[in-house]
Each structure stands twice: as C-alpha cells, then as structure tokens.
Amino acid sequence: MKKLVFLFIFLSSNVYLDNLNLLCKGTIGWVIEQDFGEMSMTLNLNLAEKTGDILLPPQLVPYMVRDKGNKFFFEDLKITDDEITGSFVLTKTGVIKSISNITLSRITGQINYTNRYRQKGFQGNCTKIEVDKKKF
C-alpha cells in the first residue's frame, strides 16, 4: 500500500514538471484581405515554473524589431486544467508597450493570438512535439 501511495504522489507531481513543446499551424488574419497561406508558430512552455517562449512567424513580427529575431518570452503565463493564457511584449517604444496575448485550449488544442495595437492575428491548432522522439 505504501508503494502505491508513493507511486501516486510521484506521478501526480511529475505532471506539471514536464516541458510542453507545441507546434501550432493556422492562418493569419488581417484587416486588409491578404492570403499568407498556412503559417506555424512554436511554443515552449515550462508548466512547473509558468515560463516559456514563443517563436512567431515573420509576418507577425513588426519590421522595427525583426533584426532581433522572432523569439519572445512570456511575461505572464497562466495555466489551468482547461486553458493556457499568456502575454509578452512584442515591441517597446519608450513607455509604450505593444503587448501580444495567446489563449490556448488544452482540450481542443486551438490557439488564438492577438495584439492590441496591430491588426494581425493568428488562429490555429496545436500539436505536442515529442522532443525525445527524433524524426532524423
């Protein structure tokens, strides 16, 4: 019986210790009708520490910061059983921050990306990347 209790505690505590790596494929929406085709973004999350980063497609990165790359770190990441939400600074000019937000359903895998000051958004579906199972 003691072994069962230990096993249960060990397994339940490891649920949130794993990193979650996601590949999200979808489309970019824009006020001006323009078809970019299917795009992808990658999320790397540490569920235990509630930290992570997002790798945006170039079409979602403003020209003024493209030379810094397309990887952004979450400042605010909230994780529940049903949903993951997060925000990060896309650009910062003086005291003005352009903050982007993601909402990810842990049930359906659907992701929504929005930015308050930019008119582009992203909507798609995410699948888990098994980093320990390499394709090549």
Predicted regions and their residues:
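Short, solvent-exposed loop/hinge segments that bridge or flank secondary-structure elements
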Residues: 20-56, 80, 90-104
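N-terminal glycine/threonine-rich, aromatic-flanked beta-hairpin/loop signature
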Residues: 39-70, 110-118
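Contiguous, well-ordered beta-strand patches that form the walls/edges
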Residues: 58-99
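Short, low-complexity, Pro/Ser/Thr/Gly-rich segments in the mature regions of secreted, periplasmic
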Residues: 123-136
